[in-house]
Amino acid sequence: MASSSSSRNWVYDVFLSFSGKDVRVTFRSHFLKELDRKLISAFRDNEIERSHSLWPDLEQAIKDSRIAVVVFSKNYASSSWCLNELLEIVNCNDKIIIPVFYGVDPSQVRYQIGEFGSIFEKTCKRQTEEVKNQWKKALTDVANMLGFDSAKWDDEAKMIEEIANDVLAKLLLTSSTDSAENSIGIEDHIANMSVLLKLEAEEVRMVGIWGSSGIGKTTIARALFNQLSRHFPVSKFIDRAFVYKSRETYKGANPDDPNMKLHLQGCFLSEILGKKDIKIDHLGALGERLKHQKTLIIIDDLDDLVVLDSLVGKTNWFGCGSRIIVITNNKQFLRAHGIDHIYEVSLPSKERAQEMFCQSAFGENSPPEGFEELVVEIAWLAGSLPLGLTVFGSALRGRKKEYWVKMLPRLQNDLDGNIEETLKVSYDAIGNVKDQALFRLIACLFNHVKVRDIELLLADSGLDVNIALENLVDKSLIHVRNDHVEMHRLLQETGRNIVRSQSTDNPGEREFLVDSNDSRTVLSEGIGTRKVLGISLDTSKVSEFCVHENAFKGMGNLLFLDISSKTFIEEEVKVHLPEKINYYSVQPKQLIWDRFPLKCMPYTFLRNLVKLEMHDSKLEKLWEGAMSFTCLKELDMWASKYLKEIPDLSKATNIEKLDFGHCWSLVELPSSIRNLNKLLELNMEYCGELETLPTGFNLKSLDYLNFNECWKLRTFPEFATNISNLILAETSIEEYPSNLYFKNVRELSMGKADSDENKCQGVKPFMPMLSPTLTLLELWNIPNLVELSSSFQNLNNLERLDICYCRNLESLPTGINLESLVSLNLFGCSRLKRFPDISTNIKYLDLDQTGIEEVPWQIENFFNLTKLTMKGCRELKCVSLNIFKLKHLGEVSFSNCGALTRVDLSCYPSGVEMMKADNADIVSEETTSSLPDSCVLNVNFMDCVNLDREPVLHQQSIIFNSMILPGEEVPSYFTYRTSDSQPFGTSSSLPIPLLPTQLSQPFFRFRVCAVVSASNGVYIGVYSRFKGRIGNKFDSFGEVHNFMEIEKGIHLCIFDCRIRLYKDNVPLSQLNYDHVDINIHITSGDWRSTVVLKEWGIRLLETGSSAENRLGNPNSTLPHVSQAEEGNMGYYTHVQGLVNEIENSEDSGDNNVETERSKKRMRLHHFI
């Protein structure tokens, strides 16, 4: 397989294909000289005469060149050498080709006509018809490309210069850097920077490269410089050494001191011109020397505005077309200089990060066998930061796997010194002590916390939170995404190390405690001091202990206490409190304590609280009477199942959020809640004993109200509100106020906890309250809901509609189209007979356990449908084949539809009928023409015992990623079969003879059917080995196919496979393969269960179908090339065993094995 341009290191920039008879001493010599002037390397053959023995060198030069410039001249086609060069160029899929028509009309080359065509025909007389056709196609293909026609140029020198500029522009976007490690992803950065630089403009433009330390700003800038410098007569990369020296020069000086600025400018001009000790006698001299020069200047790691103003103060200091690029981690610094064109360097994707790490650790883009999971783990530990990836890779390079495993704990817990040194520079450069304090606070306690929460908790801290956050963002030390503050893992660890350095011996002397063992020590031994501002203790990382009775006595400044588990594993109380404990000096602002062991809260803990969070506590009550907790904003007692009452909140008037979800012992809400005029959220879900709500609500600020599964709640009060999210599902509410209206409601969920129709008012009274603002509506278990009124058509913003277990619902409105609706769920509406038709924009359609009898032909109008599930539809009899016309459809399930007998077009209005004939296609030509261009599906017909399977099996225009059918034998449709029953965890092989025609296509396609006996889901993997008579071999590893919906029984598991037929761009037919061994390996989705492969079969499929043509490159939407999922890496062990078995059963000949994808590159895809 040819290397991609993003990973290939090229020997030459250009290969020039030409006829020496026409252009050797004219065009060629001038063009090569222009390339030299632009520092573009080109392959030369001046001193060699072409002979047969030199062809391998020419062939290699073509492969090693990034761009091919093909000069078509009158006699080009007279040379078989030229035509073979052209053919080789075209066969290199990664080659950029620039055609030049020099003294010849492009149409003569394109169609091989005129004088050019006559010469071509003479050359072809000595060749076979096959060679002639290959040359013709190559000439036509290249002549159809955008190029240069000399007839349109009056000045050949200008044409040559323009061709060279075109080459340079293409190299700018595609050339790799000197280091393969640094080249990964660099093209994307260069392309984005090219847009900002706007090189074609004559203006002088200043551009900033902005990003956090270690993210690769300098790497990008150097790659840019390597490519751009050829464009500029004067160019200089000003590195950090000069910048640091300039800082020292300026340090302590008067910013307005002209002598200091003159000195800086003199040093700067010396750097640019490469001369020592240039003296400048006035501040305008720098501009005078450069204003007529097209200049490229890149300044690295600068954040001092005075220095920047002195060096590149104004655009008119530089000549037309100049570009000044400034690299910094301070965005405000760029804005202050008037630089508006700023490129933000973001972290690489997870996949790119792993490639970068592999380049550093292995010198390749992918890991060796056995290192896959370690690479994923270490790339995550580096947080995808390029600096971390490089440092970690260098530390592990050349080491054995055992060493890597031993190093993991150190990488998890300790920050590498080189990384910390680099990142600490960014911290030191913050300058403002308040901003530094907030940086440490975020690193230790507030990473991934809402901005609003940070603002509330630090409202009176004097830290100027909003300004400090903005400054940290500008310096690339944090990001704010979705209203949450995010700090990179390595920056976070740097901040924590800064705090640890405050006291290496006594953690009680640090401002923040974040190491759980240190926190445990301070709390259990009572050694905390007034320096401690915050404690975070992850209970999942410590053993059980008791807090010292004087633990809080010395920590009078403690503001933030977080004792919680960072895992989802339930655990017993880990942190105990003694009966006599001194709380009086502690007044935290935030108290988070999972499984708090006391029955009542200590009062002193509450006085200044802004946030109180006590999940799964032992509390029975919070406090007595009406306490004046005016600072309290959030009260979260989730899952405190012993809590019997909510205290008087009448004096806690600033509360914005109350969460008593899963507090099973609560019986009522206190009447004082109606005084909470700032309340935004009230969550009471799963409060199973809650019976009544206070009346007289006037909570105009309330936005979210949740009474889900409050089974005993029977009344709902009238109250004024601007609520947007109301959840009343699984309640026993019998009646709603008649004038209840929510004008701003966006999400509404309601339903009954029982099905007693006598107590159910139904949904009709709710119709008037349904506002056009509604985006989500859930109606659950409403027995007397028979139909929906036509007023539904007014819900133009509705995106999701769930009507579930409404067993008497018979119809939906017709003649309406809810254009915003993308998800419709009618699960359990057993009397609904007609397929819904209320929106053609639906993506997700759940019709499980409905009474629908057919999927009609109109299903083809659901253009955006991606998932259709109709499990347990016992009345379903027919499914239209039009379902396969939906190109976005990926998952279909008709399992347990016992009445389903056919999947066909019998109800299509044109009257198209199915055709059956022995040994013939089962679908007519007319039917086939109406099927889709491409469709990749996961289909489930499990337990559809009456289904006619033939029409489905014969669909070659559909690519089945997985299909489950009923049956206990391989259908006759599969022409190659085996019947040897295989127990759990084993494999089976089928030899298939190959015809030359089957290897002349770009893909080898086949369909597999495995008869599987299993109790639950299974995975089936495929491995193919092509073999020839001379011992040559070619391996292909397919994906792992997921059949996780399988239930206990015997089923047919069917899936399609596609193998790319290539080996370094040579068709397999040239490698003389005469048969292929196709092997499948089956494993259970649950290690506790067994699976038996009873028999299996294969049918070869035609290639070149419309589906194949649309899908094109195998690295597109086909599941065979999707990314591996970490959870199933263990499957590779089974496949390797399979390969080993095959190897052992054959004669040795490993040197002849060409592997399409090495085992380390095997990829998994799981359909969920």
Curated annotation (Swiss-Prot):
GO terms for cellular component: cytosol; nucleus
Catalytic activity reported: NAD(+) + H2O = ADP-D-ribose + nicotinamide + H(+)
Protein name: Protein VARIATION IN COMPOUND TRIGGERED ROOT growth response
Residues in TIR domain copies: 10-171
Function comment: Disease resistance protein of the TIR-NB-LRR-type. Part of the RPS6 locus that contains a cluster of several paralogous disease resistance (R) genes. Resistance proteins guard the plant against pathogens that contain an appropriate avirulence protein via an indirect interaction with this avirulence protein. That triggers a defense system including the hypersensitive response, which restricts the pathogen growth.
Xref: Gene3D superfamilies: Helical domain of apoptotic protease-activating factors, P-loop containing nucleotide triphosphate hydrolases, Ribonuclease Inhibitor, Toll/interleukin-1 receptor homology (TIR) domain
Name of the gene encoding the protein in the UniProt record: VICTR
Gene Ontology molecular function, alphabetical: ADP binding; ATP binding; ATP hydrolysis activity; NAD+ nucleosidase activity, cyclic ADP-ribose generating
Upper classification of the organism: Eukaryota, Viridiplantae, Streptophyta, Embryophyta, Tracheophyta
Source species of the chain: Arabidopsis thaliana
Enzyme Commission (EC) number: 3.2.2.6
Domain notes: The TIR domain mediates NAD(+) hydrolase (NADase) activity. Self-association of TIR domains is required for NADase activity.
Disruption phenotype: Loss of [5-(3,4-dichlorophenyl)furan-2-yl]-piperidine-1-ylmethanethione- (DFPM-) induced root growth arrest and inhibition of stomatal closing mediated by abscisic acid (ABA).
Family named by the database record: Belongs to the disease resistance NB-LRR family.
First-tier enzyme category under EC: hydrolase
UniProt LRR repeat ranges: 539-562, 606-629, 631-653, 676-699, 701-720, 721-744, 795-820, 839-865, 873-896, 1065-1089
InterPro entries with a match to the protein in the record: AAA+_ATPase, Apaf_helical, Disease_R_plants, Leu-rich_rpt_3, LRR_dom_sf, NB-ARC, P-loop_NTPase, TIR_dom
